[in-house]
Amino acid sequence: MRFLFPGLMALSLACAGLAGAAMAGPSLAGPNLAGPNLAQAQDSGMVKLETADDSRGWDAVGKLVLGKNGFCTGALIGPQLVLTAAHCLYDKTTGVQIRPEEIEFQAGFRNGRAVAYRRVSRAVTHPDYRYAATDQLDRVANDLALLELSQPIRLPSLLPFETGATPVEGDAVDVVSYAQYREEAPSIQEACKVLAGRRTALILSCSVDFGSSGAPVFSIRDGVAQVVSVISAKAEVDGRKVALAVPLAEPLAALRQALEDSKAASLRGGKTVSVISGGTRSGAKFIKP
């Protein structure tokens, strides 16, 4: 995985709860990845969705409050299902999973109020995700989690997003996220680009920061926004800030199966717990935002 993207430098998980632990990150050496797409890696156009009109159609994106561990971003992909990044579910200090009941999804949170509030009753990560992986790029692979809410969200104004096929290099994508210093309302960045891609990760020109982890990456097809990827980390390529995202199309089936397996285990007499892989403390380093 170390040479997945040549030229990738100083990877940093983008969970807001990690902001206080920022420190210089190691470089991942590799040949130059210069090119016409990377020359435009720092797209602009971040727009804050501060009003009901601004947010119309995006309220299924929400703030995921992680108990006392900060927040991430999540997206509703079913009445009772929220998609986010797997690393959001771990305490950054201990490496121990956060109990599902400590997590709250605040759909469409804006200026102190959410369209809907739901506690999480169950959380699963992708079966191949390893929080404790020593190689930072390995931590991006399969960095996906599926959360089951305590009750479905059924509101005419808040419809779950569809999911879609993985975008390819050169495709335009949108990202809706919360982040450090803009946690009171979501922001949208439209028409950033897929700069490079592999089966397990994408490099995007989108702007992300702590708190953006788990944010949905959208492709707009026939006027419909489809979630195609999830933000995992921020990084640098040849000195340019980029975002790393996890493709969704292939891993989603495994995530759904992990959730069903967790439910089945509970019915057999086990407790309702999150099914988390690799729960030991990580040695990952973080760069300053």
Could you tell me what each predicted segment is?
Residues 141-144, 149-208, 212, 249:
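Chymotrypsin/trypsin-fold serine protease catalytic domain
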Residues 57-104:
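Catalytic histidine site
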Residues 42-56, 90, 96-153:
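Conserved catalytic-core segment of clan PA serine endopeptidases
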Residues 65, 106, 218-221:
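Core beta-strand residues in small-molecule sensory/regulatory alpha/beta domains
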Residues 75-76, 207-231:
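Catalytic nucleophile loop of clan PA
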Residues 85-88, 228-237:
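Short beta->alpha transition motifs characteristic of CBS
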Residues 2-77, 257, 261-289:
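Protease-domain processing segments flanking chymotrypsin-fold serine proteases, especially trypsin-like
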